[in-house]
Design a protein with these regions (language model features):
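Double-stranded DNA-binding cores of transcription factors and transposases
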Residues: 2-9, 54-56
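Basic, short loop/linker segments at the boundary and entry of helix-turn-helix/winged-helix-like folds
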Residues: 15-66
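Structural motif
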Residues: 45-55, 182-185, 357, 380-392
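Short, charged/polar micro-motifs that form catalytic or ligand-binding hotspots
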Residues: 46-50, 60-68, 88, 208, ...
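Polybasic low-complexity intrinsically disordered regions
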Residues: 49, 76, 107-254, 263-265
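Short, positively charged, Gly/Tyr-enriched micro-motifs
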Residues: 49-120
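An anionic, glycine-rich sequence signature occurring as long contiguous blocks
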Residues: 254-362, 367-379
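Basic, amphipathic alpha-helical segments enriched in Lys/Arg and hydrophobic/aromatic residues
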Residues: 352-421
Length: 421
């Protein structure tokens, strides 16, 4: 009996001889939906022949996933590695082809590709998974986590100081961090401001000079998010204490209908409230929240006749004890009197207590991989805000595909949370 081996384009070996890691690499690229890439690549193909088309985007995914440092090194690896050629359609482009790709697509084109990967993840139920720890009556929608990452720029950063004391660099889109950093000291670079879901899927990343405050970017970041994903509904956004201002609390809820869960600094409440922010009844007993009215923008508290359980008798009679309603005396707090103290997610509310630990857990997990996602390797010398933005979006695309692949392979919903109940 004669056996024939059909050669696969780009693959110089028998597929049966591949190692488990190599087969996993092939399976990863087999799960990439071509409809996430091809329509965008074809739209931005230019006036000449389409050439490599979507294959160049796949090559960029190879670069990020395999941690290849430069376009030149990527072009060399595509020529030498048959697995890389196989998953990219047997292409062997020069390093200039990737520069042309960035100029043609720009941040807008790469953003469109990332949007399609996010839509794919949404179709699999990865953006808004069930989290059993959260209250069932919470506001429905996707829970967001905001964070920023400092990116060191290693190329063309030689600076000159003018007479006013301002620094000017070869790349005018970079700046000093603005203050001493615990790790990078006074390095020069950009800052990546990102929003991701509570399950870890990155949704949007915007770049700014390193000295721009997170507070100055967060509203614009949410505005871009809502405009980019108009078919999605967002409910909460978890932020660290650096965002804890009355204006941010107010604007996020009033302009976007999203409840900000911000790690609070110490607050002092007015007369009539205890130190934890609970209102007191006229006889000094602590009241408990009963319902949050999002339409009327107020929270209703009730005493639930707690004085009946008190061992100390009241000095004056309480008329609410005789009422048939179990809630007893009621009182309202209004969002307009201060979103930090009386808003929809105050520190003593159940949703705040449940979401706060997720912020800590996600930050610790992503803190270990931030440099793997966005860190500007020393041999990467991207210049200009557009090229650095593309660099960050490429990492977001790969991270989104990583989460999709893990789910299709093992059913794992999130890389940062244990949601496989």
């Amino acid at each position: 009996m004669v056996q024939f081996q059909v050669p696969l384009p780009g693959l110089a070996r028998d597929i049966g001889t591949l190692t488990a890691e190599e087969k996993d690499f092939l399976n990863y690229f087999c799960t990439i939906d071509d409809s996430c890439i091809s329509p965008v690549a074809d739209c931005y193909a230019g006036v000449g022949p389409k050439g490599y088309g979507a294959s160049l985007i796949l090559a960029r995914i190879v670069k990020i996933r395999e941690r290849i440092l430069s376009d030149r090194q990527l072009a060399t690896c595509l020529k030498k590695n048959d697995l890389y050629r196989f998953v990219t359609g047997d292409i062997q482009p020069s390093h200039n082809s990737f520069n042309t790709l960035r100029r043609r697509l720009g941040p807008k084109g790469f953003t469109e590709i990332h949007k399609r990967f996010v839509s794919k993840a949404h179709g699999l139920g990865l953006l808004n998974p069930e989290v059993k720890e959260l209250p069932k009556n919470r506001k429905k929608g996707i829970i967001l986590v905001a964070d920023s990452t400092f990116l060191i720029t290693s190329g063309s950063t030689k600076g000159e100081k003018d007479q006013q004391g301002n620094w000017h660099f070869t790349d005018d889109s970079v700046a000093f961090l603005g203050k001493g950093h615990h790790k990078h000291k006074y390095a020069v670079g950009h800052k990546a401001h990102s929003l991701r879901t509570i399950s870890g899927v990155p949704l949007i990343t915007l770049l700014s000079p390193a000295n721009i405050s997170d507070q100055d970017v967060v509203l614009y970041l949410i505005e871009e998010l809502v405009d980019r994903y108009r078919h999605l509904e967002f409910s909460y956004i978890i932020l660290d204490r650096g965002y804890d201002t009355e204006e941010i609390h107010h604007d996020i809820y009033e302009f976007f209908g999203i409840i900000a869960v911000i790690i609070k600094k110490k607050m002092v409440y007015p007369k009539g409230f205890n130190k934890d922010g609970y209102p007191l009844c006229p006889w000094g007993f602590t009241m408990k929240p009963k319902v949050i009215d999002y339409q009327r923008k107020r929270t209703r508290y009730a005493c639930f006749k707690v004085c009946n359980k008190s061992k100390q008798p009241l000095l004056f009679a309480c008329d609410y004890i005789k009422e048939q309603l179990k809630s007893g005396y009621s009182k309202y707090t209004y969002f307009k009197n201060g979103y930090r103290k009386f808003g929809p997610a105050v520190p003593h509310s159940l949703i705040y207590k449940k979401l706060k630990p997720f912020r800590t857990g996600i930050e610790r997990t992503f803190g270990l991989v931030k440099e793997n996602r966005y860190f500007m390797e020393k041999s990467n010398r991207y210049q200009g805000i557009n090229n650095v933005t593309i660099h960050a979006i490429e990492h977001d695309i790969v991270l989104t595909q990583d989460i999709i692949f893990d789910y299709l392979k093992s059913g794992k919903i999130s890389p940062v949370l244990n949601l496989n109940y």
